[in-house]
UniProtKB/Swiss-Prot annotation:
This is Dihydrolipoyllysine-residue acetyltransferase component of pyruvate dehydrogenase complex. CoA binds at R461, S475, S566, N567, G591. Its EC number is 2.3.1.12. The active site is at H620, D624. Binds 2 lipoyl cofactors covalently. The gene is DLAT. The modification Phosphoserine is found at S100.
Amino acid sequence: MWRVCARRAQNAAPRAGFGARWTAFREEPGAPCVTPQAGSALARCSSKTPGYGRVRALCGWSPVSRATPRNRVLLQLWGSPSRRWYSLPPHQKVPLPSLSPTMQAGTIARWEKKEGEKINEGELIAEVETDKATVGFESVEECYMAKILVAEGTRDVPVGAIICITVDKPEDVEAFKNYTLDSSAAPAPPAAPAPTPAAPAPSPTPSAQAPGSSYPTHMQVLLPALSPTMTMGTVQRWEKKVGEKLNEGDLLAEIETDKATIGFEVQEEGYLAKILIPEGTRDVPLGTPLCIIVEKEADIPAFADYRPAEVTDLKPPAPPPIPSPAAPVPPAPQPVAPPPSAPRPAAPAGPKGRVFVSPLAKKLAAEKGIDLTQVKGTGPDGRIIKKDIDSFVPTKAAPTPAAAVPPPSPGVAPVPTGVFTDIPISNIRRVIAQRLMQSKQTIPHYYLSIDVNMGEVLLVRKELNKMLEGKSKISVNDFIIKASALACLKVPEANSSWMDTVIRQNHVVDISVAVSTPAGLITPIVFNAHIKGLETIANDVVSLATKAREGKLQPHEFQGGTFTISNLGMFGIKNFSAIINPPQACILAIGASEDRLVPADNEKGFDVASMMSVTLSCDHRVVDGAVGAQWLAEFRKYLEKPITMLL
């Protein structure tokens, strides 16, 4: 967890900072707030004018500081055009500071001080979750917490919003017991007491957040951004159970992001008191409370019924069985009975084949085209009533009475088994689909193919693996990665990226290796492949591929890369064309090696060689055709004469 002093936050963003005397809105008793007219108020300000210090601080602001516009802040400080007097003791309105350069809103993760407590200089006031991390918010002056205006767990609090009130004297705390920000900021004071009976109306909102104040000291663990493009995630699995002790660094849960499944670690010690999001819950927005952690094991039972408002709309994935048809279609042990209702086969029909049905049910059946002989009645004496029509699900094999015999197989009427299966789209699969579509629609692909004689590589590989016996083995793919990296150094245009306004030519070669996983395709990266040896590359590839298949890759291990390799040769594919991984400019598709007859200077005039076909997909905006051909020539040279990789 990061901790930042408000003084540093103040320097980074002049518009906010707790304890900064010119940024906390200090209101003196009896001091009128007058809106300056066309800047005239600034001209009339003197050192004796109430709020002069605040105005003087504002005078030093400029648009370059990226602070809040001057007229907007003046309006916040001075209030409405009408005069108003405050009967409250001197106090400071503490705004939410900007704790990161890109922060626009924050979440109050936890209040470290309670109302009435003394706050010493340097003490932690609250923990605020920004767009980057959870940051400790410290005081830079001594004061007392008079009123907390934003409850724990409140999300998307705008930067600059008033979050609490502090006073200089402990005897002034009581005056703010019933203080609300709306009542103090209202333009017309007499109108404020009138709607006070309506104050219970907003009470449901605090009641949803009330757990933060009425429960023992605890911390809400919110869903963080585990990748730069992540907007929501899926809770794949909880690694800890309620009541278990958590140590710093322990794996708490596995979260499926838009890139991969990533382990979510605990940042501090405690006990897991409540799991708020069950396993399998999909599309959980960032910042949603996932669980509750307490410091003391004795506090765990207090959170048995804890349920914040943020998670009420989140539901785990619905089970595949359809609830309504399951009741009227029980499994029939007697296949002789035509209708699915085996318990009372003769109930719907009378002595002469008459069907007992209520007038309303008969009308509804006619409108819906339902054959009443197939409906089981649940009314008196087996009479069909409206409820039976509403809950009836016709079977597919119901055109004739004879065809009604097959349905007793399973109780799933709407979707016959064996026709198709709907597989939910994971976040990873959705992102893969979006990026592939974007690549094909926006990148002008062209393709170059070449055959490579792999005879020398196979001989060198055999010798090296003998030397490494008992250690890791070098594969043909490792030679391909090394040759690709060296070819990128020779032809740097292929190791470039299209950045809309510029073409970025990379000076290091990070090879992305396509790996197929149960969740979808992912491309872990062999960093600095151009300076690594074959053994190091082999170890990296094995480690990354294992992590990818187990869903344990960290974001930095698969985000980035300057050149991609996709190898389908192990499946017997001779050649194929791969889709470029933006913003990269090239991807190399590797086919299988096969023995071919090639011309040779010997008595027979030919020889048998192991030939491999490769296809280079290029972005024509970055790599021209001749440049792509030059890269393939360098690549083939390194593989057909692997000793040149040492140069």
